[in-house]
Design a protein with these regions (language model features):
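Short amphipathic alpha helix immediately N-terminal
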Residues: 92-110
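Helix-turn-helix DNA-binding module
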Residues: 108-132
Length: 156
């Protein structure tokens, strides 16, 4: 079944979401690694048994290992989808469309940044930035359409 432009956009947005999730979980993992050995000072509460500091460390290590596994899974999924998208993008015939897709989805640039990278050297860029961003939107629409065409050819 051929992908429609709507389905391709959803796929690209899902890829961005996957990249963001991977980045956030990797940051969380780094933070957890920095604090895994920290033991909180026990509070004395009469009549309550307190857990030993070793229990907290053991739980932290188990949580750290689980998060490491999750980050590795996300990284594998991201790499697979990156490769699949790159195979499609490299077959798009228009160089500017390829560049836009890579800037947006692989470099995670926002639209004004993309517009500046394409048109920032123009004399009227500052006053007409909105028009240049809109031009990028239109180019993106054509690029997604081109990706759908490429995908149909790859499947056939």
């Amino acid at each position: 079944m051929a992908e429609t432009a709507v389905a391709m956009r959803k796929r690209l947005e899902a890829y961005i979401d996957l990249r963001r999730e991977l980045k956030m979980q990797a940051l969380r993992l780094d933070q957890m690694r920095q604090t895994v050995g920290d033991v909180k000072s026990p509070r004395y509460e009469p009549g309550k048994a307190s857990a030993t500091p070793g229990d907290a460390v053991a739980r932290s290590v188990v949580a750290l290992e689980a998060l490491e596994e999750r980050v590795a899974e996300l990284a594998d999924r991201e790499a697979e989808e990156h490769d699949a998208l790159e195979r499609i993008i490299c077959r798009v015939t228009n160089a500017q469309q390829r560049a836009l897709l890579r800037l947006r989805y692989f470099d995670m640039m926002e639209w004004p940044e993309i517009a500046f990278s394409f048109y920032g050297d123009r004399i009227d860029y500052i006053t007409e930035e909105r028009d240049y961003v809109a031009k990028c939107y239109r180019l993106h629409t054509r690029a997604v359409s081109s990706m759908c065409t490429v995908r149909r050819r790859m499947i056939a």
